[in-house]
A protein has these predicted regions:
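Acidic, negatively charged sequence signal
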Residues: 1-23, 48-111
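Membrane-targeting and insertion segments and their boundary/processing signals
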Residues: 3, 26-33, 45-48
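Short edge beta-strands and adjacent turn/loop segments
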Residues: 18-40
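A short interface-forming secondary-structure element
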Residues: 38-52
């Protein structure tokens, strides 16, 4: 029980410090996000504003990818600690899939 409490505290600390940085395929946008969905930074390369309409789409898609990657980092840590078959890991994975859907569809929606 004490070991579980220590592991739980470690996971919580690790999750609060986890970030992911993702760059768009065209290199115009770099986003750093936390697994909670919080955005730490948005960086644009010079000349990125040449086509503002497509830049908006690129920013939105890159944010979604960064949020998902950050959340998946926490899931990997949870799987290593609790096991891949853990009901808690399964529940968190379902929440991640709902909150941060894979980019690639025509729209990106968040709950």
């Amino acid at each position: 029980s004490r070991q579980l409490a220590q592991e739980s505290a470690r996971l919580e600390t690790e999750a609060s410090q986890t970030m992911a940085t993702v760059t768009s395929a065209d290199g115009r946008v770099t986003i750093t996000a936390r697994p909670t969905g919080a955005i730490e930074s948005v960086r644009l390369q010079s000349g990125a504003a040449a086509d503002l309409a497509s830049l908006g789409v690129t920013i939105t898609e890159t944010i979604a990818r960064a949020q998902r990657v950050a959340a998946e980092k926490v899931l990997v840590s949870m799987e290593q600690t609790l096991g891949a078959d853990s009901p808690l890991v399964a529940a968190v994975r379902q929440d991640v899939d709902t909150a941060f859907p894979q980019v690639g569809g025509s729209t990106i929606e968040y709950r």
